[in-house]
């Protein structure tokens, strides 16, 4: 039986896809470069900015360049997000209901701690989470399971008793490698893509997601 719920942030709690695309586009314009892939934004979904920058440009960069470009992208993203912060439909109600029922709740995200705290506070959700694990807390990004294993450890719940909501393919893979259930959220990928990555099912939003029904595989 599932005992705890772990949420990715971007595309699961915050409907942030448009803001991320705008931030990457603005960064590329600033540095005068074209993306190295016909669908560049798909390369970045679920990855820390430091990992996404070399993929987006498809060339070798110094560690200093990567850090500077990643920091600038994060700043641009926060600016765009603050100007139009939107939560995924139904997720606020669902999170509050989990808190009311005292179901352990965590965030496991590739975003920085600074971004997470500012965005979740702006969305009115920060206080409803027992544990928050960000890119600042781990050595390896998704699809490595570290972020989700750390979330489970801090919740003091066995990984196999955790349910993860994820919108990215690498995030679903990370959850499954951690031994957790995974439900996809189709804000960035199709249901078929998420299920093929390892999700047991997928939802468009949280309007029809209820506890304890979702706790049962």
Segments (PLM) and residue ranges:
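Asp-based, Mg2+/Mn2+-dependent phosphohydrolase catalytic module
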Residues: 1-3, 96-99, 103, 112-217
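Conserved G/P- and acidic residue-centered "switch" motifs that form tight phosphate/ATP-binding loops
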Residues: 8, 12, 109, 167
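Short, flexible loop segments at the rims of nucleotide/cofactor-binding pockets, characterized by
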Residues: 81-86, 110, 179-180
